[in-house]
A protein has these predicted regions:
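Cap/lid segment of the alpha/beta-hydrolase catalytic domain
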Residues: 1-32
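Active-site loop->helix "elbow" adjoining a glycine-rich segment at hydrolase catalytic centers
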Residues: 30, 59-62
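Alpha/beta-hydrolase fold nucleophile elbow
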Residues: 47-59
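Short, hydrophobic alpha-helix immediately C-terminal to the catalytic nucleophile
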Residues: 62, 66-70, 153
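Hydrolase active-site cap/lid region
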Residues: 67-111, 166
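The feature captures the conserved acid-bearing segment of alpha/beta-hydrolase catalytic domains
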Residues: 92-151, 157
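Catalytic histidine-centered segment of alpha/beta-hydrolase-like enzymes
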Residues: 169-181
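Alpha/beta-hydrolase-fold serine-hydrolase catalytic core, especially in secreted/extracellular enzymes
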Residues: 186-194
């Protein structure tokens, strides 16, 4: 992902900082880059002979996997895990990112309605998924405060109430992770494995 790990900007206070440091237009640009990067990986995998690809991601990776499922028909299944689908609505609860966004908004006199409209460009809620309903599974934690369960529920509603798995836990502590990993395996068994 852009702005994460070795792709973080020098001096970033935390991994992923760059997603928020440049406002929501920067966020949209970073998401477009993430989609481009992943589609390049799909190209490479197909070139090497891979004929089936399922996609999962956690947190912003869940957002990204949901977005990619709306733009690339080569994906056989998608499983967003603790996805955030409206970061503009949840960023107020994300410390320290919320302080950066608050300062940027104050200094630039940013209109909240304009911000909401700007985030629609890269929102998976703005596009119909290309992955069939029976190949979509959303996983979320009941106690998640970084990606509140309401975020996953919004995606679930948008995706025609596809398969959904709740786990006890939060964004960091995935209690019963083996349960949802087994669910993922069962979910993909018929179309991903011979």
């Amino acid at each position: 992902m852009p702005f994460h790990g070795s792709r973080a900007e020098k001096g970033s206070p935390f991994s992923g900082y760059g997603f928020f440091a440049h406002g929501f237009s920067g966020f949209a640009e970073a998401m477009a880059q993430a989609v481009h990067d992943f589609r390049s990986i799909i190209d490479y995998l197909e070139f090497t002979g891979v004929d089936r690809i399922a996609l999962t991601g956690m947190s912003l990776g869940g957002y990204t996997s949901a977005l990619i499922a709306s733009v690339d028909d080569r994906i056989q299944a998608v499983i967003p895990n603790v996805p955030v689908v409206t970061p503009d609505q949840t960023v107020d609860e994300w410390f320290p990112a919320n302080k950066v966004v608050e300062l940027r908004s104050r200094l630039s006199h940013t209109d909240s309605e304009l911000t909401k409209a700007a985030t629609l460009y890269s929102s998976p809620l703005n596009y119909q998924p290309l992955v069939p309903k029976d190949r979509r599974l959303i996983i979320t934690g009941l106690g998640d405060r970084l990606a509140p369960p309401e975020q996953a529920e919004m995606l679930w509603e948008h995706w025609d109430r596809c398969a959904f798995h709740w786990f006890p836990g939060n964004h960091i502590l995935h209690v019963s992770q083996p349960d949802y990993l087994r669910r993922m395996t069962r979910f993909m068994r018929d179309f991903m494995f011979d």
